[in-house]
């Protein structure tokens, strides 16, 4: 009985994050109008309340790998809503503000959206996936009327 309990204690943490919520490897590719989306932020927001989202960033080819508790550990297992955001560089500050470096850093406005803003929020993107145990590959082909 002691051996069985010891085995259970050793196996239980496998595939779980530091909070005990299981995570699974997640990667994929994001394109917009058929072109790779580089430098986009990717978030998987779990439907399960109290579960932290998984985050990632796309490379030059639009590929991403998600992190929840550690590097490339994946996303929480279960249904997740997806948000993808990408903006251009922030607009220049007016000269009178740019002189004060501290003010310039704290007052930077976000840049122009480079993909449709509906994808910026997990509530409005309409992208939803089920993360399952093991490895998961989710590609997203985004559509819209913004020119790439």
Q: Whereabouts are the PLM-identified features?
A:
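Beta-strand-dominated extracellular/periplasmic modules and repeats
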Residues: 16-148
């Amino acid at each position: 009985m002691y051996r069985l309990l010891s085995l259970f204690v050793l196996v239980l943490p496998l595939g779980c994050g530091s909070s005990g919520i299981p995570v699974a490897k997640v990667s994929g590719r994001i394109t917009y109008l058929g072109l790779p989306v580089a430098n986009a932020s990717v978030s998987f927001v779990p439907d399960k309340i109290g579960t932290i989202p998984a985050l990632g960033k796309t490379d030059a080819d639009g590929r991403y790998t998600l992190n929840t508790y550690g590097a490339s550990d994946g996303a929480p297992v279960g249904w997740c809503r997806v948000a993808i955001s990408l903006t251009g560089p922030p607009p220049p500050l007016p000269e009178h503000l740019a002189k004060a470096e501290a003010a310039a850093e704290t007052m930077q406005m976000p840049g122009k959206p480079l993909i449709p803003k509906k994808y910026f929020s997990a509530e409005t993107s309409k992208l939803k996936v089920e993360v399952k145990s093991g490895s998961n590959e989710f590609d997203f082909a985004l559509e819209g009327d913004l020119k790439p």
